[in-house]
């Protein structure tokens, strides 16, 4: 994929990056609610390495993300999210229950800070497809 404004090396060749990590389902209560008070959550995807791949792709860098996700609708939706944001996902592995018995997508809960109250994150990634 060619981009209009690629980031170039010293020899004017375009940069290519691959990030390796875990894409995770992010659940956030709406309107700065605290998790303990929430009756609903907004779902999106994240994870440090996935976010870096997406940010680089948005800057016009040829970006590839490698991870293992469960072979179910959550894993496939995470891959679709990355691809819709111009991140290459060819090396992604869709894991079966035989390969990773729990076959889970890591999840984290983000309580968005408000005013002087800081944001809080709770991770639930034990036995996820990548770990």
Predicted regions and their residues:
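Alpha-helix C-terminal capping segments
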Residues: 51-62, 84
């Amino acid at each position: 994929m060619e981009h209009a404004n690629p980031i170039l090396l010293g020899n004017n060749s375009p940069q290519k990056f691959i990030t390796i990590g875990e894409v995770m389902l992010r659940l956030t209560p709406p309107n700065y609610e605290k998790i303990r008070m929430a009756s609903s959550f907004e779902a999106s995807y994240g994870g440090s390495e996935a976010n870096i791949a997406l940010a680089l792709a948005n800057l016009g860098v040829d970006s590839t993300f490698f991870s293992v996700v469960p072979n179910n609708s959550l894993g496939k939706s995470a891959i679709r999210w990355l691809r819709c944001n111009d991140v290459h996902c060819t090396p992604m592995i869709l894991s079966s229950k035989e390969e990773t018995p729990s076959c889970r997508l890591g999840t984290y809960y983000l309580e968005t800070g408000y005013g002087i109250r800081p944001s809080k994150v709770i991770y639930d990634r034990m036995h996820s497809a990548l770990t």
